[in-house]
Amino acid sequence: VQHALAVAGRFGLPVVPQGARSGLSGAANAIEGGLVVSTEKMTAVLEVDPGNRLVVTQPGIFNADLSRHVEQYGLFYPPDPSSWEFCSIGGNIATNSGGLCCVKYGVTSDYVLGLEVVLASGEVMRTGRRTVKGVAGYDLTRLFVGSEGTLGVITEATLALRPAAARPHTAAALFGSARDAADTVAAVVAAGLVPSLLEIMDSTTLRAASDYLRADLPEDCAALLLWQSDLGADAGRAEIAALGEVAAAHRGEVMIADDPAEAELLMSARRSVLVAL
């Protein structure tokens, strides 16, 4: 990567970094006369440090693969875009991806501790830290997060991890109007409830997911609100029920997914939206 950028800089060639090419905005599209630098083969997990709850990884690894790798240490990486099975960590960092769990756990920038980046000159820069607290100097790491490859090519990332959460409880509510579903979300926040997942799917999305999965998903509603709680057995059920009460107060038809297969179907529907549409 260093050599490629140094040569491109010498000859004035534009450089486009590419990860898994799963983004929809065209940020990784090639430019005529330019040089594409692909990181898709840079998939190694270089280190997992359970004591400091961090992982050091190359940028080409898929989000889901990294998540599964750290699970064996009793840890998890919260940012989980719906495309997590086929989007890369480098792309997540470059676009500051969120995910289905961002309502509780935040977005990618909240977990990037440090980066190794190759600049346009071919120079390698290391930013950030390996500690929870790091307040000295300019926060160059956050400058690169979300920069979509315009400032350099990410070649290594140090990411914060969390202790593995409990198996989530899942529920959903059907609404006759998207406005009622949106008002429910606002009411959930106002009530101080913090589910581990809170997602809306409108009727168009539900039909697309149903066709794609060949599944019997609800299609006679204007919107479906999906939520989860990872607080554990009793606390999780209580939080699920509390959100259900809020949804019912806004004319939602609440469904508690006690069957793991039903819960998995709802989650698969949400994760399939990108390709289904």
Residue ranges of each PLM-predicted region?
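Noncatalytic alpha-helical scaffold of FAD-dependent oxidoreductases
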Residues: V1-L277
